[in-house]
Amino acid sequence: MSFKMTQSQYTSLYGPTVGDSVRLGDTNLFARVEKDYATYGDEAAFGGGKSIRDGMAQNPNVTRDDKQVADLVITNALILDYDKIVKADIGVKNGYIMKIGKAGNPDIMDNVDIIIGATTDIISAEGKIVTAGGIDTHVHFVNPEQSQVALESGITTHIGGGTGASEGAKATTVTPGPWHLHRMLLAAESLPLNIGFTGKGQAVNHTALVEQIHAGAIGLKVHEDWGATPSALDHALQVADDYDVQIALHADTLNEAGFMEETMAAVKDRVLHMYHTEGAGGGHAPDLIKSAAYSNILPSSTNPTLPYTVNTIDEHLDMVMITHHLNASIPEDIAFADSRIRKETIAAEDVLQDIGVFSMVSSDSQAMGRVGEVITRTWQVAHRMKEQRGSLDGDSEYNDNNRIKRYIAKYTINPAITHGISDYVGSIDEGKLADIIMWEPAFFAVKPDVIVKGGLINPAINGDANGSIPTSEPLKYRKMYGQLGGNMQGTSMTFVSTTAYENDIGKLLGLKRKLRPVHNIRKLTKADMKNNSATPKIDVDPQTYEVFVDGEKITSEPATELPLTQRYFLF
């Protein structure tokens, strides 16, 4: 016998369904459900009097050996991803996403492709948003505490370089040489994130570069503080082509060895990841931003200039001076800092993100960027651009799906593609590591509710351990069992070069984490950047620094207030 209920009743039980819209935090953005995998009336839900009970939505006969039986089911989740905004159950097995579909007991329920059995645990996601774990590809490994801060913001993968609080690490995202790379690979065993390290890219002797790739580096960083010359860049790219790794470039702010055009001539048609492409974080002054028009350049922003606000310019000068070891008593050092901070190019950066010219967002952690704010600032930009520029083509009232898919790609799938790890992480897709972030919609992009890392909860908001219920105050992020014993190694990956993987670097160093090789990098173009592949003509006026896209001046007004800010940090 069928039972009818109102849409509001249904939503309160099982979350939104097709046609419903969900507001993201206190932004002006709304996600509309495009598809619901549920069979109405056969929804799987856990709790007293609910359907996931023996002989009902839980099958009493199956064992874990059945390939369709999940270790974990996340029920009735609203999935926001670069290619879908859907309501579904998520099945996890052996720490990987097994299936996105309909969970339950196929003996009595229709359309079940994820079986719940006696060996299955449940996380209830009714009314909650689920996203893939974020990927930050511009990390200065200056402080190991960054990992926990990032994890609690929804980031599950860090790529970059460093060795701790050395001047080189604080400035240049470089882990130089085999000895340092091996030490950092060992250190990664105790970090709760997926990790990949970049080596130093400055050497005309290819052996000095190749030995870093053999030691596990997943790419090389060419940075102006070590000398971002056309020669250094050319040699690094030659090695990258030989070993299928990525080159990350912090270009030559002072134009000492040439201008932007000379750098691009040295790059030729070879792919590289251009860091902080607007230029405030470093790079050819004043026109590095033009490089985003090239089809072989994969451009990213770092978060200190995102979004553009009334405070952005003032805070940046001190950041540049400290990060790059400059001396305030030397006029040339002051001029160096001043050359990087241009309100005209910063004002254009948000727009270039919004129209899909800039493809990624990263942090630049403790080196002019904030490791725990990649996700928050990405969505603040999306809000500001809708506020100033209106809806994107194809979006409408209470439906910002196109803009949502564009912006979520910037810190999930696109950085994964750029660094050759998209087979493993970067989206909510079958076969990928179960790095899954759950959000209460009101707290979206600020404070995740539950972080699932490699199939295990770690961490989660939880109450006083002596409380009679799990919500006894103080509610705060607490480490879970995913960070205890051997689970730190079992739920995270360390990414290494293919040559290091094939030569069993894990055995050499006694590593226990899952090692995975980076690959499919050197043939990438900007067309591979999901929802962010535009290559218009970009010009910069050398006198005024105004930015023009296809002949049209682009700019934005500095924000005086933003969503996802103070009201979320009173407790």
From Swiss-Prot:
Q: Give the top-level enzyme category.
A: hydrolase
Under Enzyme Commission nomenclature, its number is: 3.5.1.5
Pathway-wise, it operates in: Nitrogen metabolism; urea degradation; CO(2) and NH(3) from urea (urease route): step 1/1
Record-level GO BP terms: urea catabolic process
> Under the cellular component aspect of Gene Ontology, which terms does the record hold?
cytoplasm
Residues binding substrate: 223
Q: Which residues carry this modification: N6-carboxylysine?
A: 221
What protein does this entry describe? Urease subunit alpha
User: What does the record give as the organism's lineage?
Assistant: Bacteria, Bacillati, Bacillota, Bacilli, Bacillales
User: Gene that codes for this?
Assistant: ureC
